[in-house]
Design a protein with these regions (language model features):
Chain A
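Glycine-rich, small/acidic residue-mixed loop/short-helix segments
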Residues: 208
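Catalytic-core "active-site belt" of small-molecule-metabolizing enzymes
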Residues: 2-203, 246, 254-261
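Conserved PLP-enzyme active-site core in the AAT-like
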Residues: 217
Length: 261, 262
């Protein structure tokens, strides 16, 4: 056990260093081909704990690998998740200094804010919809501390599910005001459309992703908390970002959210 | 080339459609230098033959309206063809594979035109103000060419691969929506296979109709009141198989479905 813990600390430090120095690490799975998904979550938790000890606050979760395309790409059949910290939020229309990211990509998503806690297992999509306070549009800036995004499933999980920053829109909707499955989205980069998407791109329904998360977290004895922000998964493929780029996503019924690099 | 030759090519393509068999593309040996303009001349002859046979035009349809397809075909303008009355399938109805060659399905928004729209310089806003209703639709494309492979003039000559259309029956006023943000899923047997939003069509489906009106104006033609026009695919096309139950769901516009039989 102590050996495992030592390994986990060592790998967590590799990722923390990459984040600090801005130089991507080699994939952990190239260093340790046997690294398991569970170990990877422990590496993630190790780094999150370090940040919390430094004074950062956990404000929510993000769900990744929610599209069939992404799951196929990584050869997996379930999503993954990461933690959102208070220093990851950027105001709508705000700017992200390019030196704060390594190799950013932008995705448009729906974010959930719950009005009551959800503790798995056996949480259903219906439970999520009943527990949802409101839904708000979001941009997620994913980033990888692994060189050239050469990630396998344990690599991205250990790296906080490749989280970077997130931006929330200003317009909120209650569950009865929108059809989550069919809610359309257009993602533009520098005023050119790069992608269109729809809610169903995230496991058929974004609320189903949140239910998955509640159940997955219960394996670690964690619940989803009222007031937390939950990024439910990308509605379209991610678009590469570089300095000078402005991204903007328009959502049916939910307005617009944008960010500049 | 003389009109009679365009007519011969049109007959060659109609034979493929009616006999449900692939034909070698026109540019392979019949006429390797067929131009886009000539492609439309062939299409014009094809339309004329069908009208003479007593078929009725339901409306034009737009093709190659997605960025991906336009890049693939190396063009900067979409194409159009015509939907005829015999191509319509009832919502919830059956499509027989034996009636077609290698059909694919895609989801689209259709415009029911309330007033004539005459180019040039027609904008998407003009189109919306002259649109009576929008309705959801599934289009079955079925290129008459071997392996669905063709050049741009070939596909234009082949009436833009038009084969069958299933229109939804819930009519909505266009000003109730941001049509570019209408989300769409296309499912086969209950499993979502393709999805997208209206903006996949030239940024906005009404933009496709505006381009159509402007393209038609070059020939002294216009979009007509009463036309029901397919604005272009929101999703990628899916090859159909026997037994498929195909369902398109459109945010706020409802659902369209059909079943594929032998």
């Amino acid at each position: 056990m102590s050996i495992v813990t030592h390994r986990i600390k060592e790998y967590a430090a590799l990722l923390a260093d990459a984040e600090k120095t801005g130089v991507g690490t080699n994939p952990l799975t190239s260093i340790d081909p046997n690294l398991s998904v569970t170990e990877a979550y422990h590496i993630q938790l190790e780094n999150i704990q370090m940040k919390v000890e430094q004074g950062l606050i956990i404000v929510g979760k993000k769900i990744g690998l929610t599209s069939l395309a992404m799951q196929k790409l990584l050869g997996v059949d379930e999503p993954d998740y990461g933690h959102l910290l208070n220093n990851m939020e950027v105001a709508n229309g705000g700017t992200i200094p390019i030196e704060k990211v390594l190799q950013p990509k932008v995705e448009a998503e729906l974010a959930f804010v719950l009005k009551k806690d959800l503790m798995g297992p056996n949480i259903t999509t219906l439970d999520v919809l009943q527990a949802t306070d409101y839904i708000v549009p979001a941009l997620e800036i994913v980033d990888s501390r692994v060189k050239d995004w050469k990630i396998k499933l344990p690599d991205t999980i250990a790296d906080n599910a490749s989280s970077g920053f997130y931006v929330l829109g200003d317009k909120k909707a209650k569950v009865d005001e929108i059809n989550l499955e069919l809610l359309g989205m257009v993602l533009s980069k520098n005023d050119e459309i790069v992608n269109t998407g729809v809610g169903a791109a995230a496991l058929g329904n974004p609320a189903t992703c949140v239910a998955w998360l509640a159940n997955k977290l219960s394996e670690f004895g964690i619940s989803l908390k009222a007031g937390e922000v939950i990024l439910s998964g990308a509605l379209s493929a991610a678009a590469d970002a570089k300095a000078g780029d402005t991204f903007s996503a328009r959502f049916a019924h939910l307005g617009q959210v944008s960010v500049h690099f | 080339m003389a009109t009679v030759e365009y007519k011969e090519i049109a007959k060659y393509l109609i034979a493929g459609e009616e006999e449900k068999r692939e034909v070698v593309k026109v540019t392979e040996n019949i006429k390797p230098d067929l131009s886009v303009e000539e492609g439309y001349l062939v299409q014009q002859e094809l339309v004329k033959i069908k009208l003479e046979e007593g078929r009725r035009i339901v409306g034009p349809k737009m093709g190659l309206t997605s960025k991906a397809k336009m890049q693939q075909m190396n063009v900067n303008e979409p194409i159009y063809g015509y939907v005829f009355d015999y191509m319509l399938i009832e919502n919830g109805g059956r499509v027989q594979l034996q009636d077609m060659i290698h059909p694919k399905v895609e989801a689209e928004i259709a415009f029911v035109i309330g007033e004539d729209i005459e180019g040039p310089n027609v904008t998407a806003a003009d189109v919306l103000s002259k649109t009576e209703y929008v309705i959801p639709a599934l289009e079955l494309i079925d290129s008459r060419y071997v392996n669905f492979q063709f050049t741009l003039p070939d596909v234009i000559a082949d009436n833009a691969s038009t084969s069958r259309v299933v229109f939804g029956t819930s009519f909505q006023k266009p000003d109730k929506f941001d049509l570019d943000l209408v989300g769409v899923t296309l499912s086969i047997n209950g499993v979502i296979k393709e999805l997208g939003a209206g903006a996949a069509v030239l940024g906005h489906p009404a933009e496709a109709i505006a381009m159509l009106a402007n393209m038609l104006s070059r020939k002294g033609e216009k979009v007509r009141k009463g036309d029901v026009i397919l604005s272009g695919a929101i999703t990628s096309a899916i090859l159909l198989e026997k037994g498929d139950v195909v369902t398109g769901r459109f945010d706020g516009l409802g659902e369209v479905s059909f079943v594929v039989t032998d």
